[in-house]
Amino acid sequence: MHIERVDTFAEFQCLRTAWDTIYQSDPEAQFFLSWQWLAGALESYPGEWLVLVARGADSTYRGFLPLRRKTIWSKSRQQLRNELQFAGRLFWADYGGVLCLPEHEEAVLNAFAVYLKQLHWSHFYLKGFRISDRRFELFMAPFADERFIVEPMTSTINDGETDNLVSPHIDLPDTFDAYLAEKLSSNTRQKLRRFLRKLEVSTEYQLTTTNAATQVRDVQILETLWGKLRREQKGANTQRLATKYGMIVQRGLEDKTCHLLILWYRDTPLGVLASFVDWDKSRLLFFVSGRDEDFRELPVGLILHACNVRWAIEHGIRTYDFLRGNEPYKYSLGATDMRLRYPLVRTQSGVNPNGKLDPGCIDEALQLAVDFAKRNYTQRAVIACQQILATMPGDEVAQRLLDALVDVSEVRGRQ
């Protein structure tokens, strides 16, 4: 098995046909490993990712592992280091994983892990790893090495009340009536039917689905309602986070992978719910929502999810995926759990092997060195330049900056 590294979007685009073929063939493939999802993330963040490509002896494609790379200054070790995550995290994907042909999974997973051990990184965060027990053992086995430490991590929110390594989902029946009868309690079923009837006969309430003509407006509504709902929790970061959600959903709408519902009262939007559609795997994935909490006449969130479930069933979708988080409302709608994994693989030293950086991060490392120099963190800037030169000997920009920093230090030393 031969492993290649791809780190430009042009190269990634050339993989689409093979990627789609393997995606359709892999029973463990999930939407956040699809070419379309990753295309949005990778194109939006050039220079921050790499994709490992597995090819057989006959050069046919056997598997893909998309990764995000970050460059971090370690305060404790006083040097730059690299971290790896699943690349889907660039677009806040809830799941990560490995894509491979099932008949070659053992060779592919082993080859990816062995290749990763040769790269320069200190921490590999496999957050939201969605993978079978069999594949997990195959992938993790090579990291049982004295150079590495493997730690199981947790992921909770809401003061520990919500476990983000639990992923509730609903296996959908053939009809919405069957869903109401089989998946809901009698109390929830009666309440939902009552509110849906009210919605259907009302001239003041309406439910709309985003189309090309309303796309810009509807994404703005999402950002506004999400921000209003989360402002107390997110504080100064609210607008930045809302804008990124809008960017991700906008890309999905352009790619025709996003289904966006809005519930209105007259001309006022009450709530919005954005989901991604995986037609290949027959799955609708709830991604983000917003609502006006001041409106109390209807349970806006419940109605939006119920209408989303109905839309999924009417379009032949077999699974409604709530993604991460075991919030109680998901179970009131008939969800059952799937468990995700979150191992951290890190080097014993806590830094990159031999202090060298991943070659793909040189531009990022140079920017950090320049920033350190501007802020008079001279020693940090010197160390960063030295690491860059250890990785890429002869790099002219790093050498010039290092020479300038040394000259400044000598002048200060004589004063």
Where are these regions (language model features)?
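Acyl-donor binding region in acyl/amide transferases
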Residues: 49, 55, 72-160, 281-337, ...
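Active-site/acyl-donor-binding loops of N-acyltransferases
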Residues: 140-177, 319-372, 403-410
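A conserved beta-strand-loop-helix scaffold within acyl/acetyltransferase catalytic domains
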Residues: 3-83, 128-145, 151-296, 403-408
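Short, charge-rich amphipathic alpha-helical segments embedded
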Residues: 387-411
